């Protein structure tokens, strides 16, 4: 498959209004007070919103669901990454966490922009606590990670983020297995970019995990 690289312009500005939700959720993860969650997603309905695709559109419901769910998936990854600023000990883990934060923020903006351009509901970053998907951490796992420090945090972060990234890759795989999905140009490029970037980061995290001192 030939991939066409899309640019990532100043659509990040579109995302600014929602950015503030992420640090506050990260703080709750540290304190363990993430609140109740309704982990649900139904075919044709995402976050309680019905998905209506116009006749003749170059995308299908699965594309919309993928974008909406991946926004939530990315948002939790950012919560995890920001915990490393205060909890991590390994400079390489901190470097990676910042890379994840800095790359997934604009990717959320790209997904929100895609949804708005197609007149679909674009959730904000707080949406991650409304759903549960492949690889996402539970409330208890986030609470444990938020309480950990130093090498213990690094290990939990790497194990958790490997699981999280693998879940994102599985979501892309499921997208392409859905009839007619993943064919719209921008959605196709974005989904493939997710696989490329997160596969590479999984390799980095596995190496870092192997370098940590034994328990």
Annotate each language-model stretch with its function:
Residues 6, 17, 41-44:
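Intrinsically disordered, low-complexity regions enriched in small/polar residues
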Residues 28-215:
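All-alpha RGS (Regulator of G-protein Signaling) helical domain and cognate RGS-like helical scaffolds
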């Amino acid at each position: 498959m030939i991939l066409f690289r899309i640019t990532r312009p100043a659509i990040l500005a579109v995302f600014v209004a929602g950015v503030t939700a992420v640090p506050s959720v990260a703080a709750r993860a540290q304190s363990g007070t993430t609140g109740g969650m309704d982990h649900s997603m139904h075919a044709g309905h995402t976050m309680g919103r019905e998905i209506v695709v116009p006749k003749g559109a170059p995308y299908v419901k699965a594309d919309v669901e993928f974008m909406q769910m991946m926004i939530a998936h990315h948002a939790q990854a950012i919560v995890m990454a920001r915990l490393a600023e205060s909890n991590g000990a390994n400079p390489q883990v901190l470097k990676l966490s910042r890379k994840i934060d800095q790359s997934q923020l604009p990717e959320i903006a790209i997904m929100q922009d895609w949804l708005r351009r197609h007149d679909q509901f674009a959730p904000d970053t707080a949406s991650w606590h409304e759903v549960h998907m492949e690889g996402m951490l539970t409330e208890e796992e986030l609470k444990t990670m938020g309480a950990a420090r130093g090498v213990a945090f690094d290990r939990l972060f790497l194990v958790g983020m490997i699981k999280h990234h693998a879940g994102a890759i599985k979501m892309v795989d499921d997208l392409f297995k859905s009839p007619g999905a993943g064919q719209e140009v921008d959605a196709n490029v974005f989904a493939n970019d997710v696989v490329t970037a997160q596969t590479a980061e999984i390799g980095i995290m596995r190496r870092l995990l192997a370098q940590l001192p034994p328990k």
